[in-house]
Regions:
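Active-site microenvironment for binding and transforming phosphate-containing groups
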Residues: 1-289
Length: 289
C-alpha cells in the first residue's frame, strides 16, 4: 500500500512528514477496514499489528521516501526523556544492537543525510526540529509524562552539545496530537503538571468547567458529576510550544499542525478513540544529502 503522507514545508533540504491512515473514512469502508484499528498504514511493531504487514509498510515508506529501508529509524518509546544520537557508527551496527540502543528512547537527533528519524504517536505530541545552520535534525515524542519531564529541553540541549545548535535558529513543527478540548484527565495527571509549575497557564491547563464551550461532538464529556472527581483538560501541543519558547526558540519559528487525532481518528491514529491495540502515526524527518 502506498503511504499517504502529511508533509511539512520546512526547508528544501529536509523532508518532514506524518503518516496518515487513509484519505477518508469512506475509503476505509470500501476496503473493508473501517473496524481495523491498524488500517491503513502502521510501521510500529510493538502494538500488536501483523508483523508481515508492518514490514511491508516499512518497505513501502522507504520507497516513497527514496531511502534505504534500514535507514528508517524508530525507537521503542517508553514515555521517558532519553535522547539518542544516530551517528554513522550506529548505522553500521547489527540490527540487534541497534534495537538495543533504541530501547527506551523517546527522541532522536542526527546530522546524517538520507536517514529518516521518527517517532510513533497516537494522541501524544510529535515534534520535529531542524537546524539549518549546522544541518542537523531532531524528532521527539512528548506524551504527558515526557511533557512534565520537559523532553523538549533534553532534546534541544542534546542538539547543542552534539551540533552546537542555537535554539534561536531552530525551525520546529508540532504534529498531530489530541486537542485541548479532547484531552481530559484526572487529578493524578493534573497534579503531575501542577508539581512542575505547568498548571498555572490557562491556555495549557484548565478544569472542565473552565473549558470554552464547543459544539464539537468529538470532545470528551466531563464525567466529574458521575464520580465526584475533578476533571481537567491539558493542551499538550501548547505546553511543548511554550517549553520550546522558554528555551529560546522564537514563537514564529514554531508551526502547530492544529490537527486533533481524537477528532480525526479516521485519518490519524488515536489510542483514546481506537484503543491502545491500534496503529501509530510515524512522524519523521530526513536531512537530504
Amino acid at each position: 500500500m502506498i503511504p499517504k503522507l502529511h508533509q511539512y514545508q520546512i526547508d528544501n533540504n529536509v523532508t518532514a512528514f506524518s503518516t496518515m491512515r487513509s484519505c477518508d473514512e469512506n475509503s476505509l469502508q470500501a476496503e473493508g477496514k473501517v473496524s481495523d484499528a491498524y488500517a491503513s498504514f502502521n510501521i510500529n511493531p510493538w502494538v500488536g499489528d501483523n508483523e508481515e504487514q508492518v514490514n511491508s509498510n516499512r518497505l513501502e515508506l522507504a520507497k516513497a521516501l527514496e531511502i534505504n529501508e534500514k535507514n528508517i529509524i524508530l525507537p521503542h518509546q517508553t514515555h521517558q526523556t532519553e535522547v539518542r544520537q544516530i551517528a554513522s557508527e550506529f548505522l553500521s551496527l547489527p540490527s540487534s544492537v541497534q534495537s538495543m540502543l533504541l530501547e527506551g528512547v523517546d527522541a532522536l537527533i542526527t546530522n546524517e543525510p538520507n536517514v529518516c528519524i521518527g517517532v510513533s504517536t497516537a494522541d501524544c505530541v510529535p515534534v520535529i526540529m531542524y537546524d539549518a545552520e549546522h544541518k542537523a535534525i531532531a524528532v521527539a515524542h512528548a506524551g504527558w509524562r515526557g511533557t512534565v519531564e520537559n523532553i523538549m529541553r533534553k532534546t534541544v540541549e542534546k542538539m547543542y552539545r552534539s551540533f552546537n545548535t542555537d535554539p534561536k535558529t531552530l525551525q520546529v513543527v508540532i504534529g498531530p496530537s489530541i486537542s485541548f478540548e479532547s484531552f481530559e484527565v484526572g487529578s493524578d495527571v493534573f497534579n503531575a503538571f501542577n508539581e512542575k509549575g505547568l498548571a498555572t497557564d490557562k491556555q495549557c491547563v484548565c478544569s472542565s468547567a473552565q473549558l470554552p464551550s464547543t459544539n464539537n461532538s468529538n470532545v470528551l464529556v466531563d464525567n466529574s458529576a458521575k464520580d465526584n472527581e475533578p476533571k481537567w483538560h491539558i493542551d499538550l501541543a501548547q505546553c511543548n510550544k511554550k517549553q520550546l519558547e522558554s528555551l529560546g526558540v522564537p514563537a514564529q519559528n514554531i508551526t502547530l499542525s492544529g490537527i486533533c487525532t481524537y477528532s480525526n481518528h479516521h485519518k490519524y491514529f488515536s489510542a483514546r478513540r481506537l484503543g491502545t491495540a491500534s496503529g501509530r502515526i510515524y512522524t519523521g524527518i530526513i536531512l537530504r544529502g
